[in-house]
Amino acid sequence: MDPELSQKRSVVPEHENEPGRAGWLPYSVAMPAGPPTPMAPVTSVAEAIARLQTIGAGLPASDGLACFNRMYLAVTQAVGTEIGQGFYADPAFMTTLDVTFVNLYFAAAQAAPGAVPLAWRPLMELRGAPGIEPIQFALAGMNAHISHDLPIAVVSTCTELGTAPGDGSHLADFQKVDALLDAAEEGIRKSFESAPELALDRHLQAVDNLVTCWTINSARDLAWQNAAVLWELRSDTLARGLFLDGLAAATALAGRLLLTAV
């Protein structure tokens, strides 16, 4: 097993409920600090990679956010390489989407505790909790980022470029990223599932059963569908807001399930 994926976490309970969500959690977790000061949005894939590296360097390897950040960094580096190699039919679309997408993560990562987007709260609250494996943190971060942030990023990108989700090669280019994510997801699952102790440890077996219920590609397929819905709702402020509220709540629920300590 990857040493970074086998490290255990410690936690200092504060015995405080999240404001406005009494009874949802028995306690809140004392979380390591993120980036020390708010940073401006990045404007290129190269800047995004550098920012991801900075965030990772400032976190303990066992921090739940670091577990996700490592996986995201690897995927972003691969996407950047493919953009440079002309792998995508519309590199401008993919570059803008990649930058818009990653900035949503950066905003969540540096948000004050009371301002963390709902979809990201499970990971941010439980990133130092005991009994949760690194694979759970990595997939919970992917859940928040893909299920909630990706539809928003697609619509924002299309708006900025004066196009629509169904135009040109957008969907085909979007789907080309799936191969990279397949490799990243397979790698993290294999590093966990190939552990010799897995067959003997009921805890690890339970975690394995839990994380196999969620896959990145299924989440991305749904994210594209939700982007199409958001695109149609872009001129209806009320309907769009209600849809986004429901999306955030559903994403948060899935995140809490993925982060179940077993």
Language model features by range: what are they?
Residues 151-207:
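Short helix-loop boundary/capping segments
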Residues 73-165:
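Long acidic/polar interaction regions in large eukaryotic complex-forming proteins
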Residues 18-99, 103, 108:
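Leu/Val/Ala/Ile-rich N-terminal alpha-helices, chiefly Sec-type signal peptides and the beginnings
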Residues 4-7:
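Short, intrinsically disordered low-complexity segments enriched in Ser/Thr with adjacent Pro
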Residues 10, 14-16:
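Extended, well-folded catalytic/binding cores that form a central cleft or groove in large enzyme
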Residues 210-262:
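A cross-kingdom marker for long, charged
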